[in-house]
Amino acid sequence: MTSLKNDVFLRALQRQRTPYTPVWMMRQAGRYLPEYRETRKKAGSFMDLCKNTDLATEVTLQPLDRFPLDAAILFSDILTIPDAMGLGLYFEEGEGPKFERTLREESDIRKLAVPDIGSELRYVTDAVSQIRRALDGRVPLIGFSGSPWTLATYMVEGRGGTDFLTIKQMAYARPDLLHHILSVTAQAVTAYLNAQIAAGAQAVMIFDSWGGALSHYAYQEFSLQYMQQIVSGLTKESEGRVVPSIVFTKGGGLWLESQAETGADALGLDWTISLGEARKRVGSKVALQGNMDPAILLSTPEAVEKEVARILADYGIGNGHVFNLGHGITQFTPHENAEAMIKAVHAISSKYHL
């Protein structure tokens, strides 16, 4: 495939020297962009958009055509794996994702199997290949998946936005059943991410969106160990380059030291932790990605630039930082503020890279 014209993001993940701090945004292809809303309308539904290779490519590239971002991320959803397992993913307007079938009965749980990635999720790998061709080496492409714990919350609860009582009850009353779900899902995620790498993904990220809902010991048992299994099973090199991995637990700032032992190249941080403090704790082992509160993008360009300067100063001089939000950009964000953030990162950060 075409050689990269901008590999600053990949070098930052490996804590190599870079001329500035690279920047991208979680959910950078999304509803805050008018062009995305037009394409979504054309697709009909969110999943139709994900499963249409041409349209998924189009929306992946939209933020790059508008902003000077340093990475593209595959447009897809974290719940593609449970859907491929036959749980029947669907979306209700204003309510988020739901599943027609849940995993609560032992008989259903024991039947759970790793899906055939090549057939059931071919629409994802086809999109990865097409996006790589369309990027033509402009910036690297990130592939991703949800973590086993986060996927299991949807598989057991049947929807997002819950208090997690059903899955936590299973964790404490029948941990054997939950471990079976997590083990099968970890195998599926490993195969899925490796398929994305084979199709052209140049870095991969594991989104543990709900890991922060767990207690200290439950996090180690039901989330972290499975992410570690995935990282250890990932393809480490493709096309003659290292394929870096990022682990991100929202609300996981207490466990950075444990996360740094997973073998991941970088850790994602939300906005509840000081970036400088995180660097002191684990910066000698891993790169760090984050960690602006997405709500700041609802303010003014001036306020955004001030916060960018503060975050960059908090990390300080040196390499190994990828600027990002602490979670996904909201649909209400003025795109002018997103642009102000990206341009400010590039303008201000060079003085920290000597």
From Swiss-Prot:
Record-listed substrate binding positions: R27, Q28, A29, G30, R31, D77, Y154, S209, H327
A biological process term (GO) from this entry: protoporphyrinogen IX biosynthetic process from glutamate
Enzyme Commission code: 4.1.1.37
Site-annotated residues for Transition state stabilizer: D77
Pathway(s) it belongs to: Porphyrin-containing compound metabolism; protoporphyrin-IX biosynthesis; coproporphyrinogen-III from 5-aminolevulinate: step 4/4
InterPro entries membership: UROD/MetE-like_sf (IPR038071), Uroporphyrinogen_deCO2ase_HemE (IPR006361), Uroporphyrinogen_deCOase (IPR000257)
Keyword presence, Cytoplasm: yes
GO cellular component: cytosol
Keyword terms, alphabetized: Cytoplasm, Decarboxylase, Lyase, Porphyrin biosynthesis
Enzyme class per UniProt: lyase
Subcellular localization, as worded in the UniProt entry: Cytoplasm
SUPFAM superfamilies: UROD/MetE-like
Subunit structure: Homodimer.
Similarity section: Belongs to the uroporphyrinogen decarboxylase family.
Protein name per the record: Uroporphyrinogen decarboxylase
